[in-house]
Amino acid sequence: LGSDSDKYNESYYAEQYSEYLKTKHNTTLLNSNNAIDVLEKSVLSTGEPLGDLSILPTWELSKLASKTVTVALSGDGGDELFFGYERFQSIANNHWLKKLPYSMKYLLWGLDRLTLNNSYINDCALYKSPGEAHFGLNSRFSDGMLNNIIPSLANITLPEEYNNYNYNPPNDINELFHRIRKAEYYGMMQKTLAKVDRASMAHGLEIRVPFLKKTMIEKVLGLGINIHQPQKFRKKILYQLLEKKMPGIQPQKKKKGFSVPLTMWIRTGLKDSFYQRLLDDQFCHTYDINKPALENILDNHINKQIDAKWPIFTLYSLAIWSKDGRVDV
């Protein structure tokens, strides 16, 4: 499954592996013209608002797979176990600044931004702790944007049980990587598993996840951190195994993520639907949304002044569910 964007389309690599393994292979491309139907159906299949735009390709891939098989394998858990996400490095690369006062961190961050485009010090350095930086990276809204769109949320605090990112400051870099990985497992990955489960079961497809087998997790955790060299590499062990098992294929080492070019689609084929759904008077009233503020963000996205696909899609998902999927009891 691919898309009409070179940035996200990985169908070429899938075709390479299929040819190497001599399997039957079909390629389908999503674009802004056929995505609108997939978008609304996929959001409704989750049974609740889900701020993860990868529900689109997951839903469509499940639909395609269910035509020929009833059970499929998923690679979920691989990025968490083997440090595949960029955010592992984004947080860890600022670890050397941990003992400096905020004013010094801000000064160094500003100098690096002006001279080297934040090549060495990123925005994570400006948070009070690695856990807060981690929470910020996984958030769909900045605090300022969320409070501007829905002012009534400004004084609401998260439940005490939501403490996934409240990990203590680590003593060393390895402990930091361990805490980040644990937070990913009990945080974002749970959302990912729910997404995959609901998208697949909407088509009667059963998904099994080898990376989350207990013996696999225990084996990888038993290897420790150093063997992965997570500050330098992502999924080092998996790439080494792949190159050994499939020497004829050059691995794709730049992670694209299982996603679609929603930034572009919102500006083109999906624009009318997003304006209609998000600026609906009843929707804005129901959720106490500051309609002019939301319209301004949507306009700025359409005009390419900002890329707000994540908050826009999250609210769009809420709007679809609220109108067509919500069941009041």
How would you describe each model-predicted region?
Residues 184-199, 220, 317-324:
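Short Ser/Thr-interspersed hydrophobic loop/turn segments at strand-loop and sheet-helix junctions
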Residues 51, 171-184, 231-233, 298-315, ...:
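Structural motif
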Residues 246-305:
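PAPS-dependent sulfotransferase catalytic core
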Residues 194-197, 232-233, 275-276:
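Short acidic alpha-helix initiation/capping motifs at coil-to-helix transition points
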Residues 161-175, 221, 287-305, 325:
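Short amphipathic alpha-helical segments and their helix-coil junctions
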Residues 31-38, 163-165, 190-193, 285-296:
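Active-site-adjacent bridging/hinge elements
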Residues 72-74, 82, 182, 188-189, ...:
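Short hydrophobic-aromatic micro-motifs
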Residues 1-162, 199-246, 306, 311, ...:
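ATP-dependent adenylate-handling active sites, centered on carboxylate activation for C-N bond formation
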